[in-house]
Amino acid sequence: MEQRLRIAIQSKGRLYDETMGLLTEAGVKMTSSKRTLLVPSRNFPVELLMLRDDDIPDAVATGTADIGIVGLNEVLEKDKAVEVTAPLGFSRCRLSLAIPQHTDYPGLNWFNGRKIATSYPVILRKYLNDNGINADIHVITGSVEIAPGIGLADAIFDIVSSGSTLVSNNLVEVEKVIESEAVLIQATGRIMPDIKRK
């Protein structure tokens, strides 16, 4: 059986679309990916492993996938034994702290004693600790931006692309913490095999 390079990618969404565009641009032709978790290439010894983005770092770290394409934000949050081998220049966003509009914001110390909702507690905790801020981190998945509006939190720490979701939820970005984009990752210390076109 032919050895194939297994690439873990996000199974849907913007990162999926842009990753497929990159592979197409590189000349990689895939078979249909409808409802299939493992999709082989028709012209390279490559197969795609379709996963949720937050599962990609673990799949690469454990050797389930040889390499992965995922947002830097997920690499930092999951803190697995992977290394970034190349930034890919697409799916750019940032992780930021945001608070309700019309809030008097004197600076980062505003967050002391406040409750912050996020899906990225590892990154947020490190940022707050590094800056001497003692806040309560409330972990939620999905729809983080509604937390202040329903009284669940005083602020949020979340992904921001255009900022329109913040505006529509009456929030304003006050601290840009990390710039993120799609990156190529491999397990720490792993040596990649040669990949030749069929």
List each language-model region with its residue ranges.
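Domain-level signature for soluble enzymes in the chorismate/prephenate branch of the shikimate pathway
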Residues: 1-198
